[in-house]
Protein backbone atom coordinates (compact mmCIF):
# COMPACT_ATOMS: atom_id res chain seq x y z
CA UNK A 1 0.00 0.00 0.00
CA UNK A 2 2.88 2.43 0.65
CA UNK A 3 3.91 4.25 -2.50
CA UNK A 4 0.70 3.28 -4.27
CA UNK A 5 -0.94 6.22 -6.12
CA UNK A 6 -4.36 5.36 -4.71
CA UNK A 7 -5.56 3.62 -1.58
CA UNK A 8 -8.44 1.37 -2.50
CA UNK A 9 -10.82 2.23 0.32
CA UNK A 10 -14.57 2.40 -0.02
CA UNK A 11 -15.73 5.90 -0.98
CA UNK A 12 -18.42 5.80 1.65
CA UNK A 13 -15.96 5.17 4.46
CA UNK A 14 -14.79 8.71 5.11
CA UNK A 15 -14.07 8.01 8.75
CA UNK A 16 -10.74 7.03 10.24
CA UNK A 17 -9.70 3.40 10.35
CA UNK A 18 -6.75 2.06 12.34
CA UNK A 19 -4.08 1.94 9.65
CA UNK A 20 -4.89 4.78 7.26
CA UNK A 21 -7.05 7.80 6.80
CA UNK A 22 -9.90 6.48 4.68
CA UNK A 23 -9.78 7.80 1.14
CA UNK A 24 -12.38 7.48 -1.61
CA UNK A 25 -11.61 4.87 -4.23
CA UNK A 26 -10.90 6.36 -7.65
CA UNK A 27 -10.85 3.98 -10.60
CA UNK A 28 -8.07 5.23 -12.87
CA UNK A 29 -9.52 3.28 -15.78
CA UNK A 30 -12.78 5.22 -15.77
CA UNK A 31 -13.31 7.85 -18.47
CA UNK A 32 -11.89 11.23 -17.42
CA UNK A 33 -15.37 12.72 -17.32
CA UNK A 34 -16.15 10.39 -14.43
CA UNK A 35 -12.85 9.91 -12.60
CA UNK A 36 -11.63 13.48 -12.93
CA UNK A 37 -14.59 15.81 -13.28
CA UNK A 38 -17.25 14.36 -11.03
CA UNK A 39 -18.57 16.79 -8.43
CA UNK A 40 -19.18 13.77 -6.22
CA UNK A 41 -15.54 12.74 -6.51
CA UNK A 42 -14.36 16.24 -5.64
CA UNK A 43 -16.63 16.29 -2.60
CA UNK A 44 -15.37 12.89 -1.44
CA UNK A 45 -11.76 13.98 -1.85
CA UNK A 46 -12.34 17.21 0.05
CA UNK A 47 -13.95 15.23 2.86
CA UNK A 48 -11.01 12.81 2.90
CA UNK A 49 -8.57 15.69 3.31
CA UNK A 50 -10.77 17.13 6.03
CA UNK A 51 -10.71 13.76 7.80
CA UNK A 52 -6.91 13.71 7.59
CA UNK A 53 -6.76 17.20 9.07
CA UNK A 54 -8.99 16.18 11.97
CA UNK A 55 -6.95 13.03 12.54
CA UNK A 56 -3.74 15.06 12.80
CA UNK A 57 -5.44 17.72 14.91
CA UNK A 58 -6.72 15.17 17.41
CA UNK A 59 -3.29 13.55 17.65
CA UNK A 60 -1.73 16.93 18.35
CA UNK A 61 -4.49 17.79 20.82
CA UNK A 62 -4.01 14.56 22.77
CA UNK A 63 -0.23 14.41 22.84
CA UNK A 64 1.19 17.91 22.34
CA UNK A 65 -1.31 20.77 22.80
CA UNK A 66 -0.70 23.56 23.81
CA UNK A 67 2.93 23.10 22.76
CA UNK A 68 4.15 24.04 19.30
CA UNK A 69 4.16 20.69 17.54
CA UNK A 70 3.73 16.96 17.92
CA UNK A 71 6.55 14.48 17.50
CA UNK A 72 4.25 11.88 15.93
CA UNK A 73 6.46 8.80 16.28
CA UNK A 74 7.31 9.13 19.97
CA UNK A 75 4.03 10.98 20.68
CA UNK A 76 5.78 13.72 22.61
CA UNK A 77 5.46 17.52 22.36
CA UNK A 78 8.00 19.92 20.86
CA UNK A 79 8.52 23.66 21.13
CA UNK A 80 10.48 24.89 18.13
CA UNK A 81 8.42 28.11 17.83
CA UNK A 82 8.70 29.66 21.31
CA UNK A 83 6.10 27.47 23.01
CA UNK A 84 3.06 29.53 22.05
CA UNK A 85 1.20 26.70 20.30
CA UNK A 86 2.31 27.14 16.69
CA UNK A 87 0.35 24.16 15.36
CA UNK A 88 -2.86 25.50 16.88
CA UNK A 89 -2.45 29.02 15.53
CA UNK A 90 -1.30 27.73 12.13
CA UNK A 91 -4.30 25.39 11.97
CA UNK A 92 -6.91 28.08 12.64
CA UNK A 93 -7.47 29.47 9.15
CA UNK A 94 -7.68 25.93 7.74
CA UNK A 95 -10.24 24.93 10.38
CA UNK A 96 -12.31 27.99 9.43
CA UNK A 97 -12.19 27.11 5.73
CA UNK A 98 -13.07 23.49 6.54
CA UNK A 99 -16.03 24.67 8.65
CA UNK A 100 -14.97 23.06 11.93
CA UNK A 101 -16.53 25.13 14.75
CA UNK A 102 -15.24 22.93 17.58
CA UNK A 103 -11.65 23.26 16.41
CA UNK A 104 -12.05 26.99 15.83
CA UNK A 105 -13.42 27.54 19.35
CA UNK A 106 -10.62 25.49 20.92
CA UNK A 107 -7.94 27.50 19.13
CA UNK A 108 -9.58 30.84 19.91
CA UNK A 109 -9.67 29.95 23.59
CA UNK A 110 -5.99 29.03 23.40
CA UNK A 111 -4.97 32.25 21.64
CA UNK A 112 -6.71 34.34 24.27
CA UNK A 113 -4.34 32.88 26.88
CA UNK A 114 -1.03 33.28 25.03
CA UNK A 115 1.49 35.63 26.60
CA UNK A 116 3.62 36.68 23.65
CA UNK A 117 6.02 38.56 25.91
CA UNK A 118 7.26 35.33 27.49
CA UNK A 119 9.47 32.66 25.95
CA UNK A 120 12.61 30.77 26.92
CA UNK A 121 14.12 30.74 23.42
CA UNK A 122 15.21 33.13 20.69
CA UNK A 123 12.41 34.30 18.44
CA UNK A 124 12.53 34.50 14.64
CA UNK A 125 10.85 37.69 13.40
CA UNK A 126 10.17 35.99 10.06
CA UNK A 127 8.72 32.73 11.38
CA UNK A 128 6.71 34.48 14.09
CA UNK A 129 5.27 36.89 11.53
CA UNK A 130 4.19 34.31 8.97
CA UNK A 131 2.85 31.69 11.41
CA UNK A 132 1.53 33.54 14.46
CA UNK A 133 0.84 37.09 13.28
CA UNK A 134 -0.32 35.95 9.85
CA UNK A 135 -2.44 33.18 11.35
CA UNK A 136 -4.24 35.50 13.75
CA UNK A 137 -4.79 38.33 11.27
CA UNK A 138 -6.11 35.88 8.67
CA UNK A 139 -8.50 34.32 11.18
CA UNK A 140 -9.70 37.79 12.17
CA UNK A 141 -10.44 38.63 8.53
CA UNK A 142 -12.19 35.30 7.92
CA UNK A 143 -14.25 35.32 11.12
CA UNK A 144 -15.34 38.89 10.52
CA UNK A 145 -16.43 37.80 7.05
CA UNK A 146 -17.35 34.44 5.48
CA UNK A 147 -16.59 32.43 8.64
CA UNK A 148 -18.60 34.57 11.05
CA UNK A 149 -21.15 31.78 11.63
CA UNK A 150 -18.48 29.67 13.33
CA UNK A 151 -18.21 31.82 16.45
CA UNK A 152 -21.09 32.67 18.76
CA UNK A 153 -19.22 35.29 20.79
CA UNK A 154 -17.79 38.16 18.67
CA UNK A 155 -15.50 39.12 21.55
CA UNK A 156 -13.45 35.99 20.84
CA UNK A 157 -12.77 37.30 17.35
CA UNK A 158 -11.74 40.70 18.68
CA UNK A 159 -9.16 38.95 20.85
CA UNK A 160 -7.36 37.93 17.65
CA UNK A 161 -6.74 41.56 16.80
CA UNK A 162 -5.77 42.45 20.35
CA UNK A 163 -3.26 39.60 20.45
CA UNK A 164 -1.91 40.55 17.02
CA UNK A 165 -1.21 44.04 18.33
CA UNK A 166 0.45 42.69 21.46
CA UNK A 167 2.66 40.40 19.41
CA UNK A 168 3.65 43.13 16.96
CA UNK A 169 4.46 45.43 19.86
CA UNK A 170 6.69 42.73 21.35
CA UNK A 171 8.51 42.26 18.04
CA UNK A 172 8.83 45.80 16.71
CA UNK A 173 12.11 46.57 18.47
CA UNK A 174 13.66 44.39 15.74
CA UNK A 175 13.34 47.36 13.37
CA UNK A 176 15.23 49.69 15.71
CA UNK A 177 18.40 49.73 13.62
CA UNK A 178 20.34 52.44 11.82
CA UNK A 179 18.68 51.59 8.50
CA UNK A 180 15.35 50.19 9.63
CA UNK A 181 16.30 46.80 8.20
CA UNK A 182 15.23 44.46 11.02
CA UNK A 183 17.24 41.94 12.91
CA UNK A 184 15.69 38.50 12.60
CA UNK A 185 16.80 36.52 15.66
CA UNK A 186 15.39 38.22 18.74
CA UNK A 187 15.56 37.86 22.51
CA UNK A 188 12.21 39.38 23.33
CA UNK A 189 12.65 39.25 27.09
CA UNK A 190 15.52 41.75 27.14
CA UNK A 191 14.97 43.29 23.69
CA UNK A 192 18.32 42.17 22.31
CA UNK A 193 19.30 40.28 19.16
CA UNK A 194 21.75 37.51 18.35
CA UNK A 195 24.24 40.18 17.25
CA UNK A 196 24.10 39.35 13.56
CA UNK A 197 25.05 42.25 11.28
CA UNK A 198 23.12 40.87 8.32
CA UNK A 199 19.62 39.72 7.46
CA UNK A 200 18.33 37.67 4.57
CA UNK A 201 16.33 38.63 1.51
CA UNK A 202 13.36 36.45 2.46
CA UNK A 203 13.48 37.12 6.19
CA UNK A 204 13.49 40.87 5.51
CA UNK A 205 11.13 40.82 2.55
CA UNK A 206 8.36 38.60 3.93
CA UNK A 207 6.97 40.87 6.61
CA UNK A 208 5.26 43.58 4.63
CA UNK A 209 1.90 41.88 3.99
CA UNK A 210 1.17 40.96 7.60
CA UNK A 211 2.45 44.20 9.13
CA UNK A 212 0.69 46.37 6.54
CA UNK A 213 -2.56 44.51 7.05
CA UNK A 214 -2.31 45.08 10.80
CA UNK A 215 -1.95 48.81 10.20
CA UNK A 216 -4.88 48.85 7.80
CA UNK A 217 -7.19 47.05 10.23
CA UNK A 218 -6.23 49.15 13.24
CA UNK A 219 -5.66 52.50 11.55
CA UNK A 220 -2.22 52.74 13.18
CA UNK A 221 0.32 53.27 10.36
CA UNK A 222 3.35 52.36 12.48
CA UNK A 223 3.38 48.63 11.76
CA UNK A 224 3.19 48.87 8.00
CA UNK A 225 5.67 51.74 7.96
CA UNK A 226 8.24 49.64 9.83
CA UNK A 227 8.04 46.70 7.42
CA UNK A 228 7.97 48.92 4.34
CA UNK A 229 11.06 50.83 5.48
CA UNK A 230 13.06 47.62 5.65
CA UNK A 231 11.64 46.54 2.31
CA UNK A 232 12.71 49.80 0.65
CA UNK A 233 16.35 48.66 0.58
CA UNK A 234 15.32 45.51 -1.26
CA UNK A 235 13.39 47.48 -3.86
CA UNK A 236 16.41 49.72 -4.55
CA UNK A 237 19.33 47.29 -4.23
CA UNK A 238 22.86 48.59 -3.83
CA UNK A 239 25.55 48.12 -4.98
CA UNK A 240 24.61 47.46 -8.61
CA UNK A 241 26.69 44.27 -8.58
CA UNK A 242 24.12 42.74 -6.24
CA UNK A 243 21.56 42.81 -9.08
CA UNK A 244 23.22 40.70 -11.81
CA UNK A 245 19.99 40.60 -13.81
CA UNK A 246 17.26 43.25 -13.66
CA UNK A 247 15.03 42.58 -10.65
CA UNK A 248 17.04 39.58 -9.43
CA UNK A 249 19.12 40.33 -6.36
CA UNK A 250 21.44 38.75 -3.83
CA UNK A 251 20.18 37.27 -0.60
CA UNK A 252 22.28 38.83 2.21
CA UNK A 253 21.82 42.45 3.36
CA UNK A 254 23.94 44.45 5.79
CA UNK A 255 21.65 45.71 8.54
CA UNK A 256 23.78 48.77 9.33
CA UNK A 257 24.40 50.01 5.78
CA UNK A 258 21.51 48.60 3.76
CA UNK A 259 23.97 47.26 1.18
CA UNK A 260 23.75 43.77 -0.29
CA UNK A 261 26.74 41.57 0.43
CA UNK A 262 26.40 39.05 -2.39
CA UNK A 263 24.96 38.40 -5.83
CA UNK A 264 23.53 34.92 -5.17
CA UNK A 265 20.25 34.77 -7.11
CA UNK A 266 17.68 32.12 -6.32
CA UNK A 267 13.94 31.55 -6.06
CA UNK A 268 14.70 29.02 -3.32
CA UNK A 269 15.16 29.12 0.43
CA UNK A 270 16.58 32.39 1.69
CA UNK A 271 15.17 34.39 -1.23
CA UNK A 272 11.87 32.78 -2.20
CA UNK A 273 9.13 34.68 -0.41
CA UNK A 274 10.65 38.11 -1.15
CA UNK A 275 9.65 37.58 -4.78
CA UNK A 276 6.39 35.96 -3.71
CA UNK A 277 5.31 39.04 -1.75
CA UNK A 278 6.18 41.57 -4.47
CA UNK A 279 3.22 40.52 -6.61
CA UNK A 280 1.05 39.63 -3.63
CA UNK A 281 1.33 43.18 -2.26
CA UNK A 282 -0.03 44.40 -5.59
CA UNK A 283 -2.90 41.94 -5.27
CA UNK A 284 -3.44 43.29 -1.75
CA UNK A 285 -3.59 46.94 -2.84
CA UNK A 286 -2.89 48.09 -6.38
CA UNK A 287 -3.03 51.72 -5.33
CA UNK A 288 -0.09 51.65 -2.93
CA UNK A 289 2.12 48.88 -4.22
CA UNK A 290 2.64 49.53 -7.91
CA UNK A 291 6.42 49.65 -7.46
CA UNK A 292 6.35 46.20 -5.87
CA UNK A 293 4.53 44.91 -8.95
CA UNK A 294 7.01 46.59 -11.28
CA UNK A 295 9.93 44.98 -9.48
CA UNK A 296 8.21 41.60 -9.64
CA UNK A 297 7.58 41.95 -13.38
CA UNK A 298 11.23 42.86 -13.93
CA UNK A 299 12.37 39.86 -11.87
CA UNK A 300 9.92 37.52 -13.60
CA UNK A 301 11.02 38.59 -17.07
CA UNK A 302 14.69 38.18 -16.11
CA UNK A 303 13.95 34.74 -14.68
CA UNK A 304 12.43 33.56 -17.94
CA UNK A 305 15.30 35.04 -19.96
CA UNK A 306 18.25 34.03 -17.80
CA UNK A 307 17.33 31.29 -15.31
CA UNK A 308 14.97 29.04 -17.28
CA UNK A 309 16.61 25.65 -17.67
CA UNK A 310 15.80 22.14 -18.92
CA UNK A 311 17.62 18.88 -18.19
CA UNK A 312 19.65 17.35 -21.00
CA UNK A 313 17.68 14.10 -20.70
CA UNK A 314 14.23 15.66 -20.36
CA UNK A 315 13.83 18.74 -22.54
CA UNK A 316 10.11 18.65 -21.73
CA UNK A 317 10.79 19.73 -18.14
CA UNK A 318 11.46 23.29 -16.97
CA UNK A 319 13.22 24.36 -13.79
CA UNK A 320 14.62 27.65 -12.45
CA UNK A 321 18.38 27.71 -11.95
CA UNK A 322 20.40 29.70 -9.43
CA UNK A 323 23.12 32.20 -10.28
CA UNK A 324 26.24 33.58 -8.63
CA UNK A 325 29.60 34.90 -9.75
CA UNK A 326 28.82 34.62 -13.43
CA UNK A 327 27.71 30.98 -13.30
CA UNK A 328 24.35 29.24 -13.34
CA UNK A 329 23.67 26.58 -10.73
CA UNK A 330 21.59 23.74 -12.11
CA UNK A 331 19.96 22.90 -8.81
CA UNK A 332 16.65 23.54 -7.12
CA UNK A 333 14.45 22.20 -4.38
CA UNK A 334 11.04 21.79 -2.87
CA UNK A 335 11.00 25.33 -1.46
CA UNK A 336 11.55 26.76 -4.95
CA UNK A 337 8.48 24.97 -6.27
CA UNK A 338 6.18 27.74 -5.06
CA UNK A 339 7.43 29.63 -8.13
CA UNK A 340 4.95 28.10 -10.57
CA UNK A 341 2.02 29.30 -8.50
CA UNK A 342 3.56 32.74 -8.11
CA UNK A 343 4.01 33.15 -11.86
CA UNK A 344 0.44 31.98 -12.37
CA UNK A 345 -0.85 34.55 -9.89
CA UNK A 346 1.14 37.24 -11.68
CA UNK A 347 -0.19 36.10 -15.03
CA UNK A 348 -3.75 36.28 -13.70
CA UNK A 349 -3.54 39.68 -12.04
CA UNK A 350 -1.58 41.29 -14.91
CA UNK A 351 -3.23 39.41 -17.80
CA UNK A 352 0.19 38.23 -19.00
CA UNK A 353 -0.04 34.98 -20.96
CA UNK A 354 3.76 34.61 -20.96
CA UNK A 355 3.82 34.44 -17.17
CA UNK A 356 0.92 31.99 -17.14
CA UNK A 357 2.62 29.74 -19.70
CA UNK A 358 5.89 29.75 -17.80
CA UNK A 359 4.09 29.12 -14.53
CA UNK A 360 2.41 26.03 -15.94
CA UNK A 361 5.77 24.78 -17.20
CA UNK A 362 7.23 25.16 -13.71
CA UNK A 363 4.29 23.31 -12.16
CA UNK A 364 4.87 20.45 -14.58
CA UNK A 365 8.57 20.32 -13.72
CA UNK A 366 8.00 20.26 -9.98
CA UNK A 367 5.25 17.66 -10.23
CA UNK A 368 7.70 15.49 -12.19
CA UNK A 369 9.89 15.37 -9.07
CA UNK A 370 6.98 13.69 -7.31
CA UNK A 371 6.01 11.33 -10.10
CA UNK A 372 9.53 9.93 -10.49
CA UNK A 373 10.25 8.75 -6.94
CA UNK A 374 9.42 5.49 -5.20
CA UNK A 375 7.08 7.22 -2.74
CA UNK A 376 5.61 9.62 -5.33
CA UNK A 377 6.76 12.49 -3.09
CA UNK A 378 9.36 14.99 -4.24
CA UNK A 379 12.75 15.45 -2.53
CA UNK A 380 13.98 18.45 -0.56
CA UNK A 381 16.74 19.12 -3.11
CA UNK A 382 17.50 18.07 -6.68
CA UNK A 383 19.83 18.94 -9.56
CA UNK A 384 20.08 18.46 -13.33
CA UNK A 385 23.71 19.29 -14.10
CA UNK A 386 24.73 16.52 -16.48
CA UNK A 387 28.37 16.81 -15.33
CA UNK A 388 27.49 16.15 -11.69
CA UNK A 389 25.15 13.15 -11.86
CA UNK A 390 26.01 10.66 -9.09
CA UNK A 391 26.96 7.32 -10.59
CA UNK A 392 24.28 5.54 -8.57
CA UNK A 393 21.62 7.83 -10.05
CA UNK A 394 22.71 7.77 -13.70
CA UNK A 395 19.74 5.70 -14.86
CA UNK A 396 17.36 7.66 -12.66
CA UNK A 397 18.61 10.94 -14.14
CA UNK A 398 18.23 9.60 -17.66
CA UNK A 399 14.57 8.79 -17.07
CA UNK A 400 13.52 11.44 -14.56
CA UNK A 401 15.53 14.43 -15.76
CA UNK A 402 16.94 15.18 -12.30
CA UNK A 403 18.99 13.57 -9.57
CA UNK A 404 18.29 13.81 -5.85
CA UNK A 405 20.69 15.91 -3.79
CA UNK A 406 18.73 15.98 -0.52
CA UNK A 407 16.39 13.06 -0.10
CA UNK A 408 14.17 13.95 2.86
CA UNK A 409 10.62 15.33 2.90
CA UNK A 410 9.41 17.31 5.91
CA UNK A 411 5.78 17.86 4.91
CA UNK A 412 6.47 20.82 2.65
CA UNK A 413 3.51 22.25 0.68
CA UNK A 414 5.02 24.08 -2.29
CA UNK A 415 4.33 21.55 -5.03
CA UNK A 416 0.69 21.08 -4.03
CA UNK A 417 0.42 24.87 -3.63
CA UNK A 418 1.49 25.50 -7.22
CA UNK A 419 -0.72 22.70 -8.51
CA UNK A 420 -3.62 24.45 -6.77
CA UNK A 421 -2.85 27.69 -8.61
CA UNK A 422 -2.61 25.79 -11.90
CA UNK A 423 -6.07 24.37 -11.36
CA UNK A 424 -7.53 27.74 -10.41
CA UNK A 425 -6.14 29.32 -13.58
CA UNK A 426 -7.09 26.55 -16.01
CA UNK A 427 -9.79 24.40 -14.35
CA UNK A 428 -8.03 21.47 -16.02
CA UNK A 429 -8.97 18.42 -13.91
CA UNK A 430 -5.53 16.87 -14.39
CA UNK A 431 -4.28 19.22 -11.70
CA UNK A 432 -6.85 17.88 -9.27
CA UNK A 433 -5.50 14.42 -10.07
CA UNK A 434 -1.95 15.52 -9.43
CA UNK A 435 -2.85 17.11 -6.09
CA UNK A 436 -4.83 14.05 -5.10
CA UNK A 437 -1.96 11.71 -5.98
CA UNK A 438 0.41 13.83 -3.89
CA UNK A 439 -1.98 13.85 -0.94
CA UNK A 440 -2.49 10.08 -1.13
CA UNK A 441 1.27 9.51 -1.29
CA UNK A 442 1.85 11.74 1.74
CA UNK A 443 -0.90 9.88 3.61
CA UNK A 444 0.49 6.49 2.66
CA UNK A 445 4.12 7.18 3.51
CA UNK A 446 4.29 9.77 6.30
CA UNK A 447 1.29 8.81 8.44
CA UNK A 448 1.84 7.50 11.96
CA UNK A 449 -0.66 6.44 14.61
CA UNK A 450 -1.18 10.07 15.66
CA UNK A 451 -0.18 12.34 12.79
CA UNK A 452 2.25 12.79 9.91
CA UNK A 453 6.03 12.74 10.13
CA UNK A 454 9.00 13.94 8.14
CA UNK A 455 10.70 11.10 6.27
CA UNK A 456 14.32 10.54 5.34
CA UNK A 457 14.30 9.26 1.77
CA UNK A 458 11.52 9.82 -0.76
CA UNK A 459 13.10 7.35 -3.16
CA UNK A 460 12.78 4.29 -0.96
CA UNK A 461 9.32 2.68 -0.97
CA UNK A 462 8.62 3.21 2.75
CA UNK A 463 10.22 6.67 2.92
CA UNK A 464 13.17 5.49 4.98
CA UNK A 465 13.80 6.91 8.42
CA UNK A 466 10.94 8.60 10.27
CA UNK A 467 12.25 11.90 11.63
CA UNK A 468 9.59 12.21 14.35
CA UNK A 469 8.54 15.77 13.60
CA UNK A 470 5.31 17.28 12.33
CA UNK A 471 5.76 20.91 11.26
CA UNK A 472 2.89 23.29 11.94
CA UNK A 473 2.66 24.07 8.24
CA UNK A 474 1.14 20.64 7.70
CA UNK A 475 -2.05 22.18 9.11
CA UNK A 476 -1.65 25.62 7.56
CA UNK A 477 -0.56 24.65 4.06
CA UNK A 478 -0.53 20.99 3.00
CA UNK A 479 -4.03 20.31 4.31
CA UNK A 480 -5.42 23.65 3.13
CA UNK A 481 -4.23 23.48 -0.47
CA UNK A 482 -5.13 19.79 -0.71
CA UNK A 483 -8.65 20.69 0.45
CA UNK A 484 -9.19 23.86 -1.58
CA UNK A 485 -8.40 22.29 -4.95
CA UNK A 486 -11.41 19.98 -4.52
CA UNK A 487 -13.68 22.54 -2.84
CA UNK A 488 -16.48 24.73 -4.24
CA UNK A 489 -16.13 28.39 -5.09
CA UNK A 490 -15.72 30.63 -2.04
CA UNK A 491 -14.43 34.09 -1.23
CA UNK A 492 -11.06 32.71 -0.14
CA UNK A 493 -10.41 30.76 -3.34
CA UNK A 494 -7.79 32.25 -5.67
CA UNK A 495 -9.53 33.93 -8.60
CA UNK A 496 -9.19 32.57 -12.12
CA UNK A 497 -8.59 34.59 -15.31
CA UNK A 498 -10.60 37.79 -15.29
CA UNK A 499 -11.65 37.32 -11.67
CA UNK A 500 -11.01 39.51 -8.65
CA UNK A 501 -9.25 38.19 -5.56
CA UNK A 502 -11.03 38.87 -2.29
CA UNK A 503 -8.12 37.39 -0.31
CA UNK A 504 -4.41 36.92 -0.87
CA UNK A 505 -2.50 34.08 0.81
CA UNK A 506 0.52 34.86 2.93
CA UNK A 507 3.51 32.56 2.54
CA UNK A 508 2.09 30.27 5.26
CA UNK A 509 -1.19 29.96 3.28
CA UNK A 510 -3.16 32.22 5.61
CA UNK A 511 -5.73 34.17 3.53
CA UNK A 512 -5.54 37.91 4.19
CA UNK A 513 -8.42 40.11 3.09
CA UNK A 514 -7.53 42.29 0.12
CA UNK A 515 -7.50 45.97 1.04
CA UNK A 516 -10.48 48.16 0.29
CA UNK A 517 -10.97 51.77 1.25
CA UNK A 518 -13.41 50.61 3.89
CA UNK A 519 -10.70 48.15 5.03
UniProtKB/Swiss-Prot annotation:
Tell me which InterPro entries the record gives.
Answer: 6hp_glycosidase-like_sf, Glyco_hydro_47, Glycosyl_Hydrolase_47, Seven-hairpin_glycosidases
- Pfam families cross-referenced by the UniProt entry: Glyco_hydro_47
The membrane-spanning stretches of this chain are none
| Pathway note | Protein modification; protein glycosylation
Q: Catalytic residues?
A: 380
User: Carries keyword Ribosomal protein?
Assistant: no
Q: Which cofactor does it need?
A: Ca(2+); Mg(2+)
Name-wise, this protein is: Mannosyl-oligosaccharide alpha-1,2-mannosidase
Organism from which the protein derives: Coccidioides posadasii (strain RMSCC 757 / Silveira)
